[in-house]
Regions:
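Internal helix-loop-helix
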Residues: 1-39, 43-44, 86-87, 93
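Short acidic, glycine/serine/threonine-rich loops at helix termini
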Residues: 28, 59-64, 87-91, 108, ...
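Internal maturation/activation junctions in enzymes
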Residues: 31-66, 70, 233, 237-250
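Short Pro/Gly-enriched beta-strand edge/turn motifs at strand-loop
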Residues: 46-52, 76, 125-130
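Short Gly/Pro-enriched turn/cap motifs at secondary-structure boundaries
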Residues: 56-59, 84-86, 104, 134-141
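A short core secondary-structure module
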Residues: 76, 80-125
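A glycine-rich, basic-preceded beta-loop-alpha segment at the flavin cofactor/substrate interface
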Residues: 120-125, 129, 134, 141-172, ...
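Extended amphipathic alpha-helical segments enriched in small hydrophobics
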Residues: 173-242
Length: 251
């Protein structure tokens, strides 16, 4: 996945792939009973998403107001207002944070759920209030999603939900770093091609010492950033199998 992001060098398309593959991660590790969804998102049969941010909290997940209630064989989510939901309208399934009834306040009271687009009766399982107007990553539809009685499936243990959530977000943070370095490499490639063709003061830009210096400086920065990003991916690859409470390898 990370090699793909580097070679793709497109933040919008890679975001869609990342939020899709993120769905597979906690299913594989903590919810083997939902393996059919893992196979669908990994083999291109379904798009995934991660919807956690709410309007009152932003990145403060502990402020989430979405309530999860066990009703018979399924959980239902109420009062959900996921305010910046990437993949809204596109995703077939999403990872969603919610607080089970009776759970403590704050981030440690959150559980992680799998939310299909359609419920068991084939009806739409959530409502997209509107899509955002964005200046960047416009290839990714981002919107506001309302959850009211939405069917969902619990990932792992409810009391460990915040840990699963942060693990899943780590995948996207690593993807962001790799994608940034891929985009930087693409920009350098295009720049080198341009300075070989463009002339000023009677010679090609590539022959000007200051231009050559700038390109060298940028190349070193890109190579260093890529090395750091790959080192982070390698560290995560060594420790991802750790479970809460994590050992020293994970920390």
């Amino acid at each position: 996945h990370f090699a793909l992001g580097y070679l793709l060098a497109d933040g919008g398309l890679y975001c869609i792939l990342t939020i899709t593959h993120q769905v597979a991660y906690p299913i594989h590790k903590y919810a083997p009973g939902l393996a059919s969804w893992k196979e669908r998102v990994l083999y291109g049969e379904a798009f995934g998403a991660t919807w956690m941010t709410e309007i009152q909290g932003g990145s403060d997940l502990g402020a989430n107001r979405t309530v999860a209630r066990r009703e018979g064989e399924v959980w239902r989510l109420y009062g959900g207002d996921k305010y910046f939901a990437s993949g809204a309208g596109l995703a077939d399934v999403a990872l969603v944070t919610a607080r089970p009834e009776g759970a403590p306040p704050g981030p440690k009271g959150l559980a992680l759920f799998l939310l299909p687009r359609l419920d068991r009766e084939g009806r739409l399982n959530y409502r997209v209030r509107r899509l955002k107007r964005k200046s960047g990553t416009r290839a990714v539809p981002s919107g506001e999603v309302e959850l009211e009685g939405s069917e969902a499936y619990l990932i792992g243990r409810a009391e460990e939900g915040i840990y699963y959530t942060l693990e899943t977000l780590t995948v996207s943070r690593l993807a962001n770093a790799i994608a940034a370095m891929g985009i930087a490499a693409k920009a350098l490639l295009e720049t080198r091609e341009r300075v070989r063709r463009r002339q000023s003061f009677g010679r090609f830009l590539a022959d000007h010492p200051l231009v050559r210096y700038d390109l060298l400086d940028l190349s070193v920065r890109q190579a260093g950033g890529l090395a750091l990003a790959l080192a982070a991916v390698e560290a995560f690859d060594r420790a991802w199998h750790e479970r809460p409470p994590y050992g020293e390898a994970y920390h």
